[in-house]
């Protein structure tokens, strides 16, 4: 699979046509400005305060800053891994590759460990945040896309509108 074919329904022509139709319908049903609908949304400006070089070959799936270090997970079969990146210059501090049968996805940090989802394997890999050694793994049903820790639970996405709240110690929901 190529980098853009990995998303099961997003790569299909039908999916593209469907998404385009929904977009056109939503645009045509949306008022041209907020005053027409009576709603007033606060406009915010975003300014870029710094840019840092990044590996253009990395198919980034997850990012998290922990203890001043940027943790990045990368995807693609045979090229997935986890790396620690210096936030000041974008250099890779250390990195590990994962088994080529896994497609790395989102990551989060819990108890000094990095938890990385895999796309279709139903496996979450657990890494030591210091040396990136594999500490263990959890199993789950379905696809793994994104994950975060909200202070109480691991919140996991499978790419749909469904979020799964999991116990961070057992990975059970």
Regions found by a protein language model. Give the residues of each.
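Secretory targeting signatures
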Residues: 1-35
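A short helix->beta-strand "capping" segment at the edge of beta-propeller domains
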Residues: 38-56, 90-91
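Beta-rich, blade/repeat-based domains predominating
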Residues: 56-67, 100-111, 140-157
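Conserved beta-strand positions in repeat-built beta-propeller and related beta-rich domains
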Residues: 71-77, 109, 114-122, 156-161
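Beta-propeller domains
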Residues: 72-96
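Short loop/turn segments that connect beta-strands within beta-propeller blades
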Residues: 86-90, 128-132, 168-171
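Blade-loop segments of beta-propeller domains
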Residues: 90-125, 132-144
